[in-house]
Structures are given as structure tokens and as C-alpha cells.
Design a protein with these regions (language model features):
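Extended active-site and interfacial segments that coordinate phosphate-rich ligands
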Residues: 70-80, 143-156
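Non-catalytic substrate-recognition/targeting regions of SAM-dependent transferases
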Residues: 117-130, 146-217, 225
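Conserved hydrophobic/aromatic pocket- or pore-lining residues that grip, position, or stack substrates
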Residues: 134, 204, 223, 240
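Non-catalytic accessory regions of SAM-dependent methyltransferases
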Residues: 1-133
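Conserved SAM/SAH cofactor-binding pocket of Class I
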Residues: 224-254
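Carbohydrate-binding surface patches
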Residues: 136-140
Length: 254
């Protein structure tokens, strides 16, 4: 397993964030993003990404998130309405809840690749988890997740064991010194990145180490099904193909 140990304890480094009136409304409404322009003050304001941001209204805690000084979305909100201890239990609970929401996919033998975590929709802003058969691909859209990466992997393995874990990073996310980077295998044996999987019975493949996103656009599954249904008896030319998923769906439908 690659070294994904924390370079600091996020719980020991906290930023006290006091939002503007507009920012406070956003936090109270459950908005997963708190922008830099909606922050009146942050103390201290020089802590690294991944530090715990505690949002205050006067002296009352109204929300908790992850501090991201390199992004205009300065706080990725994890909780609103009070305090939250950012600890491994939180990741286990959220990954479990996300998995429960996808119960129809997990046990479907005709679909062996699916999105486990879809960022903000699952209470984990800037984090995506896609599972291809027995390989888990973690995509970071924010450097704030780096200090928590080891705990995220441990939580994922506790909830649903994977033989291999691969890290992907958005272009704007730079790994800390000596930390694993885009395309690195964090758990399991090394491989070239190409995997074969099923999507509603169609055999597809993706390069999860170098391909776009996590290798394939798993969130487009329903759209591929719609395209296939619309191609009955038609001749179709796919001129903007990436991994060929829409072309395969069209061929199967036509």
C-alpha cells in the first residue's frame, strides 16, 4: 500500500471562520460550498488544506467543513446546524449511507461498475468514488481531502472491501511533497490501468489510471441506455467518442 499517512492531524489544526451575512445564510441553508467572498474573517488563515474549518455565528458553531486555501470555494461544508467531530466514524457513516442509496446497483450482475460517492450529493464535497468490479478509484477535486485520504481508504475498505485502490486527481489538485499522485495505485497490485466491466450487460473497458475522470463516465449510464433505445433500426456515427460507451449502446440498440 502506498503511504497515505497524514502529514498533520486535521483535528489539531482548526480555522475559526466567520461568514458574511450572505455566507451565513448559505451555511444555514445547507449549501455545501462557502466561497472566499462570503467569509468575513478566518483565524488563523494560513493553515494548510484539509484543516477543519469551524463556522461561527458570533460564538455559536453553525457548521463544520474542510479548509481549502487554494480554492475560491474556501470551505467544503460537511455539516450545518452545529458542531461535528471530523473523525473516521464520519467517513464510515457517509460511505455506508451512499452505498445504501445505490443498493440496486451493487448486487446487479449485469452492471459491475458504478459511482459510489458523487461529491456534494453524498455529503463529501470534492470527492468522487467509482468502483470498477473489485477496483475502487478515488478522485480528488480538492486538495483538502489529501490529509484525510488514509482514513477515507480505511473507511471504504471497512464498508465494501476492494482488491485495489487507485488515486486520481483533478488538474488543479497538486499532491503534497512525497504524497501519492494522479494514477498511483494505493492498495493492491500494480497494473497498467485497463479494466473490463459490464454496464447493463454490455462489455466495456476503461483506463482508470490515465483516462478521463476516473476512466469512464459512469454517471452517464442512464443516458447511454436512452441513446440505445433511440437507435432502434438506425445507422449511427459517434464522432465525439471517449471510451466508446455511447457507441456501444447505440450498436446494441440498433
Amino acid at each position: 500500500m502506498a503511504d497515505v499517512s497524514q502529514t498533520f492531524d486535521p483535528q489539531s489544526r482548526r480555522v475559526a471562520v466567520r461568514p458574511t451575512a450572505a455566507g451565513l445564510r448559505a451555511v444555514r441553508s445547507g449549501d455545501p460550498w462557502l466561497f472566499d467572498g462570503s467569509i468575513a474573517s478566518a483565524d488563523p488563515n494560513d493553515l494548510p488544506a484539509g484543516s477543519v474549518a469551524v463556522v461561527f455565528d458570533d460564538r455559536r458553531v453553525v457548521g463544520v467543513g474542510l479548509w481549502d486555501p487554494e480554492s475560491p470555494i474556501r470551505v467544503k461544508m460537511l455539516h450545518s446546524g452545529g458542531a461535528l467531530a471530523v473523525e473516521p466514524r464520519v467517513w464510515v457513516d457517509r460511505l455506508t449511507a451512499a452505498l445504501d442509496r445505490r443498493h440496486g446497483l451493487v448486487d446487479d450482475p449485469l452492471t459491475t461498475a458504478w459511482r459510489w460517492v458523487h461529491g456534494e450529493n453524498d455529503g463529501l464535497p470534492g470527492l468522487v468514488l467509482d468502483r470498477y468490479v473489485d477496483t475502487l478509484v478515488i478522485k480528488l477535486y480538492s486538495g483538502a481531502w489529501y490529509p484525510h485520504l488514509g482514513d477515507i481508504i480505511a473507511a471504504a475498505q471497512k464498508v465494501l472491501q476492494s482488491e485495489r485502490v487507485v488515486l486520481r486527481c483533478a488538474r488543479r489538485v497538486s499532491p503534497p511533497a512525497d504524497a501519492p499522485g494522479d494514477g498511483d495505485v494505493l492498495v493492491g497490485s500494480q497494473f497498467d490501468g485497463t479494466l473490463t466491466y459490464l454496464e447493463r450487460g454490455l462489455t466495456m473497458s476503461a483506463d482508470v489510471r490515465r483516462g478521463n475522470k476516473t476512466g469512464a463516465f459512469l454517471d452517464q449510464r442512464d443516458n447511454r441506455t436512452l441513446v440505445g433505445a433511440a437507435c432502434d433500426g438506425a445507422r449511427v456515427l459517434d464522432v465525439f467518442t471517449a471510451t466508446g460507451g455511447f457507441a456501444l449502446a447505440a450498436a446494441a440498440g440498433g
